[in-house]
Amino acid sequence: MKKILFFTVVLISGFSNAQDVRLLKGAITENVVVNDSLGETFSVYLPTYFDLSRPWPVLLVFDLEGKGKSALSMLSNAAEKEGFILASSDNTNDSLSISQNVLISNRMFNNMVSLVPIAKNQSYAAGFEGGAKFASILPTFIKEVKGVVSIGAPVGNIEILNPKSPFKFIGIVNRNDFNFREMEALRDVLDRLKFPNQLLVFDGEQLVPDQNTLASALRILTLNGMAKNEIVADPQFIQESFDMFLAKSNSFLSNGTPVLAEYLLSDMKRIFNPLMDLDSIKKTEKSLRRSSSYKQANRSQNNYFLKEDFTKEDYAYYLEEDILTYNYPNLGWWKYQMEELDKLDKSKVLYERQMASRLRGYINALVEDNIDFIAADKTVDVEALNFLYMLKTIIAPKDFDNYLKIISNSSRIEDYGTALFYLEELLKNGYTNKKQLYELPDTALFRITPEFNMVVEKYLKEARYEVIEQ
């Protein structure tokens, strides 16, 4: 049975407007009200062993689609293990300005401070992808936030970082992620700015890290607090943490990934300075770097980095040219490029497979950025948008929204041949939402053509011939 806390804000914060707040321990409490007049809410996770007798570290978790509970659920196991409170707003959104999102976050944070005892200098921010980019700029605006856990994304804006107010930055990234290269380069930038930082790198099919990696990031925040004398040092905790990270490094070696082992050993020197003597780590790292297995693996990875850089330059150049000239014939070249990446996915060479994954992520992000840029223009270039949507069907064939946009845009200019082609491609790829098809904007005339309904009947077994009222 879940344990339940029941207390009033006034008993903790002295607010004049008391409200009863019921927070679950070991589970996510949704729809906690920030401000009745603004209609803002957030979700909270408290560890099962939470009590009001001592202050706790808090991690503000951001998902810019406003899915607070979903964001918390991915970090709740790590928070349970490492003793962190989690809070996530339901109202932050990428459609809002940075200043609006900061104000929403600040109101949530202030509400958290009034509800539960928060440890001094132990308030942090975290996020996944877009949410991570926002989290990385939050310490600039909310001074109580002392660190960031950024999962799969670099710092949102390097220019606003203030060397006089550094915060802890912990990046977590898969080597398959196209952001990996940028996050790796970010370490040097943060070092120059004297921002303490680590980068936890992992491999695997899933771009989202496992729970142990997420828990490691939270543990590093605690160790950093001990190193700065903001948290009372616990020698047993420090030694257990050291042994845990060293065991992880050894597992990388035994699994044939010496580069990952070197990444972690390098970070251990940062994490445990000045908490303990680092001579053993320095010797281990030096020995690893001299080994033939590491030299060969590092050389191979760097060679693929170079090849990747050249390919990215080609992608950027040809995409710009194709957009400017509406170069539809070159869609065949892009299809060939994706087929080549598909072949590399089956390579026996790890670094080649990882390069293919990063390149696919890069071109997808590049196309998305161009779509956003063109769509935001006062005079939207519909033909350029249509080209990009067509390209998206090649690089992300299961993203059905792009097919629907092409069908709608093509029908608007009565290019029914193009609309029909992408209708069939859409259905070939497994799309089944007939209701949405018959309600697509600007397709009223197209939907009543025999050709449209024949294709629908071919793949969905039944067509609707009458005109549907809009």
Residue ranges and their predicted role:
Residues 53-65:
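Short beta-strand element of the alpha/beta-hydrolase
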Residues 112-115, 120-166:
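Primarily recognizes the serine-hydrolase "nucleophile elbow" in alpha/beta-hydrolase
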Residues 169-174:
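Short beta-strand/loop motif that positions the catalytic acidic residue
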Residues 196-269, 275, 282-289:
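C-terminal catalytic histidine-bearing segment of alpha/beta-hydrolase fold enzymes
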